Amino acid sequence: MDACRALTLNDIPRMVEINEQGLPGTGKVSHQEMADLLGLSELALGLDNERGLAGFVLCLLPGTRYGSLNYAWFNQRLEQFLYVDRVAVADEARNGGIGSLLYQSVIAHAHRLDCPVTAEVSLRPPNPGSVRFHARHGFDEIGVFETGQKAVTMYIRKEK
């Protein structure tokens, strides 16, 4: 497996495919929405294996023109942060450490920026695997945000 690399517009079809495999936890997006997210991202990294792109992460800084209510929740409460909008790993590559490698790069980037990392995890519908993943990577719960039928747990990872 190679090191993390910068994502490009050529990666969008595979990113959408991987994202679809993570539903409902990742949230559905079109090819255009994924391209828009890529353009807004402070950090957009992918990891390849022998089959090509195996996982990716997209992160945003505060004050970005992005319509996510979850992102807005952090914007209203924190001045500085690196927001993980989505991290997704292909079905065939899960449990192989790709998510952890991507998060190591996210955490290192946040350290360089001297800011915490933020993310949300679906509470309704539940995503227990993501809860465990974020706990393993040093994230703490800082709130719950509910919108209609959905609810998410808000997480932050500060430098220890």
Model regions: which residues?
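Conserved acetyl-CoA-binding loop-helix of GNAT-fold acetyltransferases
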Residues: V89, N95-A108, R136
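Active-site rim helix/loop that mediates acceptor-substrate recognition in acyltransferases
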Residues: P24-E50, T64
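Conserved active-site alpha-helix within GNAT-family acetyltransferase domains
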Residues: R124-G143
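C-terminal "cap" of GNAT-fold acetyltransferases
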Residues: V144-K160
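A short beta-loop-alpha structural element at the N-terminal edge
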Residues: D2-M15
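Conserved GNAT acetyl-CoA-binding A-motif
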Residues: A110-L123
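A short, internal acetyl-CoA/4′-phosphopantetheine-binding micro-motif in the GNAT/acyltransferase core
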Residues: D85-R94, L123-R124
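Conserved acyl-donor/pantetheine-binding loop and adjacent beta-alpha core of acyl/acetyltransferases
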Residues: L58-R86
